[in-house]
């Protein structure tokens, strides 16, 4: 793993952008995208640039079950607001949170991933070490799955909703096994609340108790952290 320490999210976003730009110059065509607060400055930097994704494909990590694409808290909406409206891709894939047949939707999304191997995957990380919505206990070889969100994840995401009761309790998420198939992975983490998860990811044992520790199995991972998120690392 390569650890890049930055002073703030703006610098972190710039570092991530440089990796994206280099990938695009080297014919990367499929970009795995994440939502949440950690990649926002990265997306702002991409939007302000002259990068062109009109010949590229995006594949998102996850979506809440029960939210329509036009719901302001859905990840479809997040991606349109933060990236797609300004930087369109030829094709953009996200799980369908309103799918009437969830098992069929999981199979469909696994096929999307198989048909569009990811060149560069963007990740954030939860306080409990989750990547995507792969909560502690998720198998390292898992494919796309419906996930029951943990209490800590629901509480962490409540800030985006009017009431905690409005936070969906389930999501469809690309599995850890699917994430590990990406050629290159870039993870953003900021703030003291992520320090424990980052220590477990980088220096802890490979354990399903810390889903992101699975990244130790991958040979091209860059972790972009501020000093607070890196504060528990031994070096």
From Swiss-Prot:
Catalytic activity entry: alpha-D-glucosamine 6-phosphate + H2O = beta-D-fructose 6-phosphate + NH4(+)
EC number: 3.5.99.6
Gene Ontology cellular component annotations, sorted alphabetically: cytoplasm
GO biological process, any: N-acetylneuraminate catabolic process
Xref: PROSITE patterns: GLC_GALNAC_ISOMERASE
Function summary: Catalyzes the reversible isomerization-deamination of glucosamine 6-phosphate (GlcN6P) to form fructose 6-phosphate (Fru6P) and ammonium ion.
Protein name: Glucosamine-6-phosphate deaminase
Species: Latilactobacillus sakei subsp. sakei (strain 23K)
